[in-house]
Amino acid sequence: MPSLKSKMRGRLAAAHGQRTNTTNNLWLCYSVKLNQDLSLASNNELIYWLADLESNRNVKSFRFGYNIQIQVNDPKENFKPIEAIQVILDTGHEEIHHITSKTGNVDAFSATFCLKDGSVRNITYRAITEDYLVTRAKYSARLLRLLPFVAQMRYKKWPSEEEIVLNTLKILKTGDIQEIIASTSVGDEMIVVGIVAKFIFQGVIKQTNLSMSDFGRSTWWSLSES
């Protein structure tokens, strides 16, 4: 008989797309950048999404579970299928990011890919290594604590409130969240906290007291450099 965990895994896969890697932890997270839920198939995907995609101002959009074929040096095989991440930069440039079990630094180069329609073209390929993900784990853990505050803002637009908070940030330049709450005319402080969390994800501001385990009124921040 299937366990409750396996049933939940099956429902998640059915609702958000079947992934080939289903033996690791599955994560269902809300993406501010895409304004939609994401199905992430491992802890490594979670780390990379938080630290290098969601919070990266140079990344416009991304797609996990992107099946594509990469050209290899083996003449017998020619192209090898991989499950990767399609990344679109704010410049419009496309890259293929591939989380691997390799060690060492991230390797980036132009590779030849065969697309689903059979066309072949060169795209920048980045091999994301285990060693690199280890260096990003603490940062992603801090961002993970912001997700509940960001998720409460989902599917809603707060243009006037965001403008008020942003103007306040520009005036204060640095401080704690309590000071932002006290300096704005937004009545609901949870909306202010949610907007601040969203701005951290978007790279507008950065959290400066990195040793703190919680996110709240006493969290310190500063404006990011343009």
Feature annotation, model-predicted:
Residues M1-S226:
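Electrostatic, structured charged patches in enzyme active sites and in nucleic-acid/phosphate-binding
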